[in-house]
């Protein structure tokens, strides 16, 4: 089974406190992700944020159109009539990621709308956008709470949208509340109820479970996973791109087109542009990943090479580095 990787470093990742990219930095990251890392899609902005953001997206779409990547460049849109869609068209993008409410609590408390009205609004925007030749994906914001507390509402929406002109329906664990067991059960329920729908899973890392939850979603049958470079994002961040790629490659039978050899370079670039340091012990891309101070472990790797295998070695550009310490056995 082929799994799409959609990276949202430039949209959800930029919601990290203190992080703001220049237009030039956004273009560099976009090119690296699509040309070198070969992620399937990138989400680069939220519509209607600012005139500066509009210009940044234009620079990305102008390059992407020439390079053949335009439909891989996605922008978040809101339920605001056609204002977001028109902003995205003006920016030169072709793919709309429409943000709808995936829980009844969010719908009634935040938007103060009925399910019927919300459904009508969604259908109208989808119809109008597709008439303009645009692709539309749909986020079900707070879907995780929706499945826990208002499942009938979730099913009402998808029952009435499964035949709409949607490319994908995207399932966010917006507040990072789910365990891998819940993710598997909820995603499996969605995939079995709607076998013809392409579902993505969008994890947040509040319990340090984003990678585990993403793997659980893949095992349940979703076709896409959302990531950010270095796990950037609000609160505890999103699913780290390098970590989930290594885990999927080494622990599942799915197919990816990711070039693992470029992941460390990408992490370093985003570290520089974002100003958010990569911890030395960060899995896969941290500088201590292949550094060992314990003599027993170092000897085991030297003689058996038991831990170093598969995508993990390709992801990190280097071999094991043994260092002197009080427990090195020398």
Where are these regions (language model features)?
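A mid-to-C-terminal "edge-of-domain" accessory segment
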Residues: 2-3, 7-9, 253-330
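Alpha/beta enzyme core
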Residues: 3-5, 11-41, 59-68, 81-197, ...
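Terminal or standalone catalytic/regulatory effector modules within metabolic enzymes
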Residues: 28, 34-59, 313-330
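C-terminal helical cap(s) of enzyme catalytic domains, especially alpha/beta-barrels
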Residues: 63, 233-267
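Glycine-rich beta-to-alpha transition loops that act as phosphate-gripper elements at the mouths
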Residues: 73-80, 198-209, 234
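Short gly/pro/ser/thr-enriched loop/turn and capping motifs at secondary-structure boundaries
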Residues: 104-106, 208, 231-236
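Active-site PLP-lysine loop of aminotransferase-like
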Residues: 174, 226-235
């Amino acid at each position: 089974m082929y799994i799409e990787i959609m990276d949202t470093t430039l949209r959800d990742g930029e919601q990290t406190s203190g992080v703001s990219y220049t237009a030039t930095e956004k273009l560099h990251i976009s090119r690296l992700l699509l040309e070198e890392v070969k992620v399937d899609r990138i989400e680069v902005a939220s519509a209607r944020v600012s005139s500066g953001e509009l210009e940044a997206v234009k620079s990305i779409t102008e390059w992407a159109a020439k390079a053949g990547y335009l439909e891989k460049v996605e922008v978040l849109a809101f339920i605001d009539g056609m204002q977001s869609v028109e902003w995205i068209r003006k920016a030169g993008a072709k793919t709309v990621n429409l943000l709808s409410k995936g829980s009844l609590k969010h719908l009634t408390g935040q938007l103060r709308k009925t399910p019927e009205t919300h459904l009508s609004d969604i259908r109208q925007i989808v119809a109008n956008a597709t008439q303009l030749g645009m692709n539309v994906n749909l986020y079900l914001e707070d879907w995780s709470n929706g499945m826990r507390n208002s499942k009938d509402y979730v099913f009402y929406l998808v029952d009435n949208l499964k035949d709409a002109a949607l490319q994908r329906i995207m399932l966010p664990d917006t507040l990072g509340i789910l365990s891998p067991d819940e993710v598997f059960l909820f995603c499996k329920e969605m995939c079995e109820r709607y076998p013809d729908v392409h579902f993505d899973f969008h994890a947040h890392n509040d319990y340090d479970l984003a990678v585990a939850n993403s793997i659980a979603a893949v095992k349940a049958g979703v076709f896409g996973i959302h990531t950010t470079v270095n796990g950037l994002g609000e609160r505890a961040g999103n699913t780290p791109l390098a970590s989930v790629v290594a885990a999927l490659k080494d622990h599942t039978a799915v197919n990816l087109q990711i070039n693992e050899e470029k992941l460390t370079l990408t992490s370093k670039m985003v570290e520089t542009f974002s100003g958010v340091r990569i911890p030395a012990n960060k899995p896969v891309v941290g500088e201590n990943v292949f550094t060992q101070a314990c003599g027993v472990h170092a000897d085991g790797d030297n003689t058996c090479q038991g831990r170093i295998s598969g995508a993990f070695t390709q992801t990190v550009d280097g071999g094991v580095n043994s260092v002197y310490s009080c427990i090195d056995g020398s």
